[in-house]
């Protein structure tokens, strides 16, 4: 069972915590993580791109010239694909890019990412993370005290913390139920509180 140090908001040690081995100590499954990333990014696509085919282009109802006797190739409509201003063949149409993924696979992907963070020593645990008011300076000081640098993903339900992180470059604050595979992979450091760990273990256990 992984045992990590807990840090308070001033950067001092506040004890240790035992992490669930089945969540924070498994062998990461890269293929499942890859599938989860593809699924999440695909779900964000609008899927609204569209072009007009020959039936949607205005006009072209009349046959340009008679079928036989002109010496020219037969044509049925000036909106056929081979004409300038004609419709498009096999063009994009509105569609949904959402992909299905079993719940067990989605949870395995999240467990794999969390386990990799522990293995890489990129998981930082705070005893708590609260601010009395939205103060970017105070949140930056807390991260500096914890010796956190680079791209940082902070998991907190505190509204003041979420607002304080908006002006910090390379820092993103998400609620506990907003923790996802794409952000966890994209940001090098992951900052969790003890309460966040308990809720994560309740969901993924």
Curated annotation (Swiss-Prot):
GO terms for molecular function: rRNA binding; structural constituent of ribosome. GO terms for biological process: translation. Residues 45-97 are annotated as: Disordered. Residues 60-71 have a biased composition (Basic residues). The keyword Transmembrane does not apply. Keywords: Ribonucleoprotein, Ribosomal protein, RNA-binding, rRNA-binding. GO terms for cellular component: ribonucleoprotein complex; ribosome. Gene3D superfamilies: 3.40.1370.10. Pfam families: Ribosomal_L4 (PF00573). One of the primary rRNA binding proteins, this protein initially binds near the 5'-end of the 23S rRNA. It is important during the early stages of 50S assembly. It makes multiple contacts with different domains of the 23S rRNA in the assembled 50S subunit and ribosome. Belongs to the universal ribosomal protein uL4 family. This is Large ribosomal subunit protein uL4. It comes from Lactobacillus gasseri (strain ATCC 33323 / DSM 20243 / BCRC 14619 / CIP 102991 / JCM 1131 / KCTC 3163 / NCIMB 11718 / NCTC 13722 / AM63).
């Amino acid at each position: 069972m992984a045992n990590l140090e807990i840090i308070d908001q001033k950067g001092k040690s506040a004890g240790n915590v035992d992490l669930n081995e089945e969540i924070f100590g498994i062998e990461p499954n890269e293929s499942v993580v890859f599938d989860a990333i593809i699924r999440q990014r695909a779900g964000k696509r609008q899927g609204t791109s569209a072009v007009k085919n020959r039936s949607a282009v205005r006009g072209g109802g009349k046959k340009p010239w008679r079928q036989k006797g002109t010496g020219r190739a037969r044509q049925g409509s000036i909106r056929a694909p081979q004409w300038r201003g004609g419709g498009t063949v096999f063009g994009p149409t509105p569609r949904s890019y959402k992909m299905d993924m079993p719940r067990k696979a989605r949870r395995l992907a999240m467990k794999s990412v969390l386990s990799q963070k522990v293995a890489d020593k990129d998981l930082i645990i705070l005893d708590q993370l609260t601010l009395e008011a939205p103060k970017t300076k105070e949140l930056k000081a807390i991260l500096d005290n914890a010796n956190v640098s680079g791209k940082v993903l902070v998991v907190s339900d505190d509204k003041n913390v979420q607002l304080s992180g908006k002006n910090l470059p390379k820092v993103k604050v998400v609620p506990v139920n907003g923790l996802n595979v794409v952000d966890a992979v994209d940001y090098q450091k992951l900052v969790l509180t003890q309460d966040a760990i308990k809720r994560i273990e309740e969901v993924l256990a």
